Curated annotation (Swiss-Prot):
It is found in: Cytoplasm. 1-deoxy-D-xylulose 5-phosphate binds at D8, H9, R44, H49, T99. 3-amino-2-oxopropyl phosphate binds at N6, R17, G191, G212, H213. HAMAP family: PdxJ. Keywords: Cytoplasm, Pyridoxine biosynthesis, Transferase. This is Pyridoxine 5'-phosphate synthase. Homooctamer; tetramer of dimers. SUPFAM superfamilies: Pyridoxine 5'-phosphate synthase. The keyword Transferase applies.
Length: 242
């Protein structure tokens, strides 16, 4: 199982004081050195954390893959074609939200998503769609030509009871198997922590987890190398469980 380290909140800390540090590039390189299989960055329309220059700098510096999260807009499409990341994950975006609140509604935007997917694919960029674990959305993702889906784990991570968490886990598990049976590559992410990652990492249909906020939070106390190492170890151990 692969670990994508999202470094958005390195930029959040930097931007809080308008300094040049901490450096997203340095964070990306440290994460790579200590177990990250790819680096994820979300270039939001309001540039609240990652800036355009960060994306170019990280793409030029890293040795693994860059997974660029972006909204379904012409501006972001143009940026992606300039940066040429290995992967683009199309996500829903609202300016007033604190973080991404739900999955992309592929059914409601099939034509536009299909158009963006073809343009990016023709440029050699692999496209992923960040969606809820809903069979209709998963089928729509396949129909528009996306080879990858990233299942939104936020409802699982934020569940307020054990029963609700189990319900959300089963939804993700079923969605992952459905997507895999359709021939899609399945990733997952959002709200995952060292404390809740194990059940998700046990789902063999899921190939990659993208984790950011909790990793950066842990890094405040452990250091980024140890935070990445512990997460990767937790994922590895989960795969060994019966």
């Amino acid at each position: 199982m692969l670990l994508g380290v999202n470094i958005d909140h390195i930029a959040t800390v930097r931007n809080a004081r308008g300094t040049t540090y901490p450096s997203p590039v340095e964070a990306a390189l440290v994460a790579e050195t200590h177990g990250a299989d790819l680096i994820t960055m979300h270039l939001r329309e309001d540039r609240r954390h990652i800036k355009d220059a960060d994306v170019f700098a990280v793409k030029n510096a890293i040795r693994t893959r860059l997974n660029l999260e972006m909204a379904l807009t012409e501006e972001m499409l143009e940026n992606a074609l300039k940066v040429m990341p290995e992967d683009v994950c199309i996500v829903p975006e609202k300016r007033q939200e604190i973080t991404t609140e739900g999955g992309l509604d592929v059914l409601a935007q099939q034509d536009k998503i299909a158009e963006f997917t073809k343009i990016l694919t023709d440029a050699g960029i692999r496209v992923s769609l960040f969606i809820d674990a809903d069979d209709r959305q998963i089928q729509a993702a396949r129909d528009v030509g996306a080879p990858v889906v990233e299942l939104h784990t936020g409802a699982y991570a934020d569940a307020r009871s054990h029963a609700e968490q189990i319900r959300q886990f089963e939804r993700i598990q079923n969605g992952a198997h459905f997507a895999s049976d359709l021939g899609l590559v399945v990733n997952a992410g959002h709200g995952l922590t060292i404390h809740n990652v194990t059940p998700i990492a046990q789902i063999l249909a899921i190939r990659e987890l993208n984790i950011g906020h909790s990793l950066i939070s842990q890094a405040l106390f452990l250091g980024l190398p140890e935070a990445v190492r512990q997460m990767k170890e937790a994922m590895f151990r989960a795969r060994l469980l019966p």
